[in-house]
Amino acid sequence: MMKMRWLSAAVMLSLCTSSAWAFSIDDVAKEAKTLAGKGYEAPKSNLPSAFRDMKYADYQQIQFNHDKAYWNNQKTPFKLEFYHQGMYFDTPVTINEVTATSVRKIKYSPDYFNFGNVQHDKDTVKDLGFAGFKVLYPINSKDKNDEIVSMLGASYFRVLGQGQVYGLSARGLAIDTALPSGEEFPRFREFWIERPKATDKRLTIYALLDSPRATGAYRFVIMPGRDTVVDVQSKVYLRDKVGKLGVAPLTSMFLFGSNQPSPTLNYRPALHDSNGLSILAGNGEWIWRPLNNPKHLAVSSYAMENPQGFGLLQRGRQFSRFEDLDDRYDLRPSAWITPKGDWGKGKIELVEIPTNDETNDNIVTYWTPDQLPEPGKEMNFKYTITFSRDEDKLHAPDNAYVMQTRRSTGDVKQSNLIRQPDGTVAFIVDFTGADMKKLPADTPVAAQASTGDNAEIVENTVRYNPVTKGWRMILRLKVKDPKKTTEMRAALVNGDDTLSETWSYQLPANE
């Protein structure tokens, strides 16, 4: 009898849950599947030339009027503000509010915005539509709403946790990244946002994705906190065959850092939103790949089955590593993808694109499955994205991790004690970790290292680092053809015991 009562309660709970909202991801999926069966219609811009041709400084003058934040008059900790169209944000997106009883379009009004010195005709913008939206929440202080989510442009979105500033971005989907045919950028064309209650600590957003060769339905559950976590569910439909599908893509920027110092004199030791790709492979191996700003497009691939996690991290958060008071790269979040369920066979790819300045996002990573269904068939992906400054949680708890990677001109000390370059490239890699710090300084730690065909190792030494209470690996290579990339891998061992994650690196061509 007790079991029957429990089942009845569960059924009632299910019914109450399903009827609590007038909308679900299945509604978006129906629309996405219908769209996939039709020809693609490119979005049409309705933007007056005064807004389309404006410069960035002019666009920055258009500010949302905070007093008119959506849900200001509702008892909810979440508020919405909207982005005006302008520059290359020149096509409107539809934004809807979902309640328990209705789905209602949020209408554009120029009264939402302060236009600064931007001259415009009010009649031409009265039905313009929004470019995107942002979510505000009292994440840092109970009496102040701060931005925690920004959804603007293509399928990009940025998310913040407590005490963080915007850095890298996530995307809904990537298509044909780094292929000669050129990348296709899907866009979120419509959003549905559930109006949260006063006690809600999470916000649910649905999105309809569209592009020439794919459509998709997305559900994002935003859970703000010290680490803000986004629970993602997607249902993707191909319109046509694609060369490569990028699932759970992350986009970041790396201009220079300790492994690739600035080519010009700069007071900043490093300038990047992320400095490495971290991977937890399906077999349990942890891999750390420092990022580069190459002179030519570079792609690195890590084949595996059922990845357990991957992300672009900002390891090393001391202000002295960046010295930038304006842009605070030390406060920019890492993003970690945790897949749910089995993703099958495929690979994690890292794409590095040359850039001369920090305004260009030149780093992309994603999961790309080996097998794709026929057009019209549904693909399901579930995962979480954690936006964090606690990188100590994002490596193996019982193994050492790479603290820093430095690159140098290789040299040899002469009999007169003067160092002379010997035509090699040297890598200085510091490993540290809680368990490693417990090892005696005379532990016989060694490095298992290997390179691709384009180099030979001329020095592989490991020494105790009393400053970090870890071990430093010095790897010196003779590169055969500098016009080609050079691959290398290494891990610290003590006999048969592996002590560290795998350090994986690609020396760019012409470096």
Swiss-Prot record:
InterPro entries: Gal_mutarotase_sf_dom, GH-type_carb-bd, Glucan_biosyn_MdoG/MdoD, Glucan_biosyn_MdoG_C, Ig-like_fold, Ig_E-set, MdoG_OpgG
Subcellular location: Periplasm
Main function: Involved in the biosynthesis of osmoregulated periplasmic glucans (OPGs).
Gene name for this UniProt entry: mdoG
Family matches, as PANTHER family: GLUCANS BIOSYNTHESIS PROTEIN (PTHR30504), GLUCANS BIOSYNTHESIS PROTEIN G (PTHR30504:SF4)
Pathway assigned to this chain's UniProt record: Glycan metabolism; osmoregulated periplasmic glucan (OPG) biosynthesis
Keyword match Signal: yes
Signal peptide interval: 1-22
One Gene Ontology CC term in the entry: outer membrane-bounded periplasmic space
Protein name: Glucans biosynthesis protein G
GO MF assignments: carbohydrate binding; catalytic activity
Keywords per UniProt: Periplasm, Signal
One record GO biological process: beta-glucan biosynthetic process
Taxonomic source organism: Klebsiella pneumoniae (strain 342)
Protein family per UniProt: Belongs to the OpgD/OpgG family.
HAMAP family membership: MdoG_OpgG (MF_01069)
